[in-house]
A protein has these predicted regions:
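Flavin-binding catalytic cores
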Residues: 3, 7, 51, 114-126
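A generic structural signal for well-ordered coil/turn residues at beta-strand boundaries
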Residues: 22, 65, 79, 145-148
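Structural motif
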Residues: 22-25, 82, 158
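Short secondary-structure boundary/capping segments
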Residues: 36, 75, 141-142
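C-terminal, flexible cofactor-proximal segment of oxidoreductases
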Residues: 118-227
Length: 227
């Protein structure tokens, strides 16, 4: 990412924390060099780390120290079997714990779709189990594979990212750069809006196409055993 920014004329400061933001400047500290700097800035935009809702933190043992919901492999709360969480609110440990400035794990759209699909299937299992009035605890089988698939544009350029899974260790890690990614991004946006308008947000042909190139959303225990 740093080399890509510099290639486009953007100066990047890594291992840096923000000390102060003024009307026309930003004061930072390079943690690795213990060097303080004052950078002129006509417009400053900060993207702070996500934190969970205060309401969640009030529930005993539901969240981590940042208020994110702790879940098991099936998107289910460790402490409350009737609570499932997907998306940005889920607690995911940092990928690299050795960084000087704490970093979080990326949560991309396809990963969140995978979490949602797994949660939906597992909730359905719980509902069916209750309707049958069975005394035993239901066995959840569906867990998200957390594969990463992303199309992004950088103005006149773009890239397609494919990581299987998104978080290391990975089996596949592919990045394709080029102007064609910009066209692909526009085409995908039109396709996505068409799905929403048509009310068919999870078409079978899309899942089949992705499956044929090795990208799936969820796996079950039966599939794990046969793999």
């Amino acid at each position: 990412m740093q080399s890509l920014l510099e290639k486009n004329g953007v100066v990047a400061y890594t291992n840096t924390k923000v000390d102060r933001v003024g009307n026309d400047y930003v004061k930072i500290t390079k943690v690795d060099e213990q060097k303080k700097m004052k950078i002129p800035s006509a417009m400053t935009m900060l993207i702070p780390p996500f934190r969970g809702q205060t309401l969640w933190s009030r529930v005993p043992h539901l969240t981590d120290k940042n208020g994110m919901v702790k879940v098991n492999d099936f998107q289910q709360s460790h402490e409350y079997s009737n609570i499932f969480a997907v998306g940005v609110c889920v607690s995911i440990p940092p990928i690299d714990k050795e960084t000087l400035v704490p970093l979080g794990a990326p949560k991309t759209g396809y990963v969140i779709e995978s979490q949602g699909t797994a949660a939906l299937k597992n909730i359905r299992t719980l509902i069916n189990h209750e309707e049958k009035q069975m005394d035993t605890q239901p066995e959840l089988r569906n867990r998200p594979l957390l594969n990463g698939l992303c199309i992004t544009d950088f103005g006149n350029d773009g890239a397609v990212f494919l990581t299987l899974p998104q978080y290391p260790p990975r089996k596949t890690d592919i990045t394709l750069h080029g102007k064609v990614a910009v066209t692909a991004k526009v085409a995908f946006e039109k396709y996505f809006l068409h799905k929403i308008r048509a009310g068919n947000t999870d078409p079978s042909y899309e899942n089949l196409m992705l499956h044929l190139i090795g990208i799936d959303r969820v796996t079950s225990k039966k599939e794990d055993a046969s793999a």
